[in-house]
C-alpha cells in the first residue's frame, strides 16, 4: 500500500512539473527578445582607426540588446553625401543613429533628417550650438596637448624650429578646435609655422611632397589619424634629415610608426569608451525614452611615446580587447 502511494505521489509530481513547464511555454509563446537596430555612420568606416571604436560599440550593444550596423562608407565628399546615407538607413528601419558628422550642419539638413530620431554624435558636435548628445575627446585639449608635447620634446623652446601643420577636415568644428588649441600652445614658443594645410589641400602624399619642396620644415604636426598616417608615409620616403612628427591617432599604422620612431609623440583618444558610451547614451533615448537634451560626454585621451607605448595605461586604450 505504501509502495502504491509512493508511485502515485511520484506520478503526480511529474504531471505537475509537466504542467508548469507547459504553462510557462504558453505564457511566453510569441514573446521574442527585443532588439533595436542602430545605424552607425562614420567617415571611411573600413579604416582600422575605427577598430577600438567598433569594439566599444559591440560591448555596449551586447549589454543593451542592440543590433549594430556599421554602414560601409568611403571618405565622404561632403555633408550632403553623408546625409543621403543616413536618410537611407532610416528608411530601412534603423531605430537610432550614431553619426560622425563630416561638416557643420549650417543649413539644417542633418537636423531635419534625424528630427524625432534618437541620435548621438561621435567625435564632432557639428554646428556651433549642437542640438544633440555628443561623445568625444575635448578637441581643443587634444590640439593643445600636441603643442605641449612638441614643446617638451624641444626643451620648452621652439626658437629656430619651422613647423608644417596638416590640419585635417576643417569643415569639422572639432578639427578647427584642435588647430586652435595647438596654435595657442605654441604661440609664444618662437616656432615659425610655415604652412597649415587642410585635407582638401593635401589629399595624398604627392601633394604633400610638392609643398615640402617649396617650404621644408623641421617639424610636422598632424591633427587627426589620417593626416598622421599620411605624414608618416611621407617621412619614410624621405632621404637625409627627416622632420619630427607629432600627431593624433589610434590606428595600427600610427602605433607602428610610433614604435619605429617615425612619430615622436602620439595623442591617443579612448575610442573604445567613445563607442561604448555612444551606445549607452542612445539606449537612454531608445529603451528608456529619456532625452537629456544637449549633453557632451568627454572621452579621455593620453600621450603615447616610444618609451611608454607598452605601459598598461597606454595598452588599455590602444588594445582594449587584449588588455
Kindly give the residue locations of the regions a language model identified:
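Flexible loop/hinge segments that line or gate small-molecule binding clefts
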Residues: 105-141, 251-259
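Short beta-strand segments enriched in small/hydrophobic residues
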Residues: 24-53, 132-133, 162-171
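Hinge/cleft segment of the Venus flytrap/periplasmic-binding protein
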Residues: 273, 277-323
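Hydrophobic alpha-helical segments within soluble ligand-binding/sensing domains
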Residues: 134-161, 250-254, 269-287
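Hydrophobic membrane-insertion alpha-helices, especially the h-region
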Residues: 7-24
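Hydrophobic alpha-helical
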Residues: 97-115, 182, 199-255
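Structural motif
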Residues: 69-91, 194-214, 228-230
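Extracytoplasmic "Venus flytrap"
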Residues: 38-55, 60, 69-80, 102, ...
Amino acid at each position: 500500500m505504501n509502495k502504491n502511494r509512493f508511485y502515485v505521489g511520484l506520478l503526480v509530481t511529474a504531471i505537475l512539473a509537466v504542467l508548469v513547464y507547459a504553462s510557462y511555454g504558453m505564457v511566453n509563446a510569441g514573446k521574442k527578445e527585443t532588439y533595436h537596430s542602430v545605424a552607425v555612420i562614420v567617415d571611411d568606416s573600413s579604416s582600422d582607426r575605427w577598430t577600438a571604436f567598433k569594439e566599444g560599440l559591440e560591448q555596449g550593444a551586447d549589454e543593451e540588446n542592440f543590433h549594430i550596423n556599421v554602414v560601409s562608407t568611403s571618405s565622404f565628399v561632403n555633408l550632403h553625401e553623408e546625409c543621403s546615407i543616413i536618410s537611407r538607413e532610416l528608411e530601412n528601419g534603423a531605430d537610432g543613429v550614431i553619426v560622425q558628422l563630416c561638416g557643420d550642419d549650417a543649413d539644417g539638413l542633418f537636423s531635419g533628417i534625424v528630427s524625432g530620431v534618437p541620435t548621438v554624435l561621435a567625435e564632432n558636435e557639428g554646428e556651433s550650438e549642437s542640438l544633440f548628445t555628443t561623445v568625444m575627446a575635448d578637441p581643443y585639449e587634444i590640439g593643445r596637448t600636441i603643442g605641449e608635447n612638441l614643446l617638451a620634446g624641444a626643451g620648452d623652446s621652439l626658437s629656430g624650429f619651422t613647423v608644417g601643420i596638416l590640419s585635417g577636415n576643417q569643415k569639422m568644428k572639432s578639427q578647427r578646435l584642435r588647430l586652435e588649441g595647438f596654435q595657442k600652445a605654441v604661440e609664444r614658443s618662437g616656432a615659425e609655422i610655415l604652412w597649415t594645410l587642410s585635407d582638401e589641400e593635401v589629399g595624398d602624399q604627392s601633394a604633400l611632397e610638392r609643398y615640402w619642396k617649396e617650404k621644408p620644415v623641421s617639424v610636422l604636426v598632424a591633427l587627426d589619424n589620417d593626416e598622421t598616417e599620411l605624414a608618416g608615409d611621407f617621412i619614410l620616403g624621405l632621404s637625409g634629415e627627416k622632420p619630427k612628427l607629432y600627431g593624433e591617432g589610434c590606428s595600427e599604422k600610427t602605433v607602428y610608426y610610433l614604435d619605429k620612431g617615425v612619430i615622436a609623440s602620439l595623442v591617443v583618444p579612448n575610442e573604445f569608451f567613445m563607442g561604448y558610451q555612444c551606445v549607452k547614451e542612445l539606449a537612454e533615448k531608445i529603451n528608456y525614452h529619456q532625452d537629456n537634451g544637449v549633453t557632451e560626454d568627454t572621452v579621455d585621451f593620453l600621450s603615447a611615446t616610444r618609451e611608454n607605448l607598452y605601459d598598461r595605461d597606454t595598452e588599455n586604450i590602444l588594445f582594449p580587447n587584449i588588455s
